[in-house]
Amino acid sequence: TPISEDCLYLNVWQPSPAPTGATVLVWIYGGGFFSGTSSLDVYDGRYLARMEDVVVVSMNYRLGALGFLYTGSEAAPGNAGLLDQHLALQWVQQNIQSFGGDPGKVTIFGESAGAASVNFHMLSPMSRDLFQRAMMHSASALAPWAVTPSEQARQRSKALAIDIGCSADEEDMDVLVACLREVSAQTILDHEWNVVDLSDAHFLADIPFPPVKDGRFITEDPAEMYAAGNFKDIDILVGFVKDEGNFWLVYGVPGFDKDTDSIIDRETFVGDIVFCHPRLNDITVERTAFEYTDWLHMDQDTMYRDALDSVFGDPFFVCPTMAVGKAHVNHGRTAYVYEFAQVASNLAWPHWMGAMH
């Protein structure tokens, strides 16, 4: 897909004949808040609109540093990408009737970072009145990669500017932002991953510029908001795939490679737990290895490989998704939960990677 800063468009599909008062489904794509587009063939909404007699909407939103640069000042207040989504939801409320949709029957849904985005709109006072239902696939705002503390976000924005060469006054963030505005978008894209410490914990699931608790759109830590019952109290659908972790493991975890069967032994398995979760102490590593070992199938050479899939996928994708479902149930709402386990027949990845993220 060609890259352009002129990207803030949305797509609308309506069934034929044109409906009146139809349900509206608004899709938010994933991609770690640094990649993605609504124009992928897999996101073509015409089939869903036709088969289910609904109006389907998707939108683009700014990504990476261009969408989530944060300085704590008006020069770069953060979460521009989420505000793009918010603006699209406002547009739906104001215009969807012209396409046969009912602004009172809007469901927002998304996958991965798109699911976290859906959850942020459920939490944000700015967005709660712009939809009625929500579906989240393979993530939520409770994922450890989905939101960053404001000070870390500020430091990463500073590091990006300095890495590009905007170091005239490191303490004046507005000056740094003004300098960044003078460089090309491609230059910013080329440098934004340099702010990630590859030796840090969770680097496989780290994102250089995720959403930030800005005090405006994201007013509090998502976990604290759920604990306090401060969220849009609605029925939801949440789900995940059977093999959430495998997609990530082939990007550097010892023993894993898309060109092999990635068979590992117990020693490698334990070492990979440390590799994926380096902040765990020795006791927790051993307990994790014990918990995820399939003791009834010790004779299967794929057992440790499959176990590490869950060791990585559970904390980053499955558990945060389930936690949101449980929170809504605890508040008397209904949460529908699914696991997607079907492996695509035309999967371009090795079959052992399964139904992956």
Curated annotation (Swiss-Prot):
SUPFAM superfamilies: alpha/beta-Hydrolases. It holds the Pfam family COesterase. Its EC number is 3.1.1.8. Keywords: Disulfide bond, Hydrolase, Serine esterase. GO terms for molecular function: acetylcholinesterase activity. It catalyses: an acylcholine + H2O = a carboxylate + choline + H(+). GO terms for biological process: acetylcholine catabolic process; choline metabolic process. This is Cholinesterase 1. It comes from Branchiostoma lanceolatum.
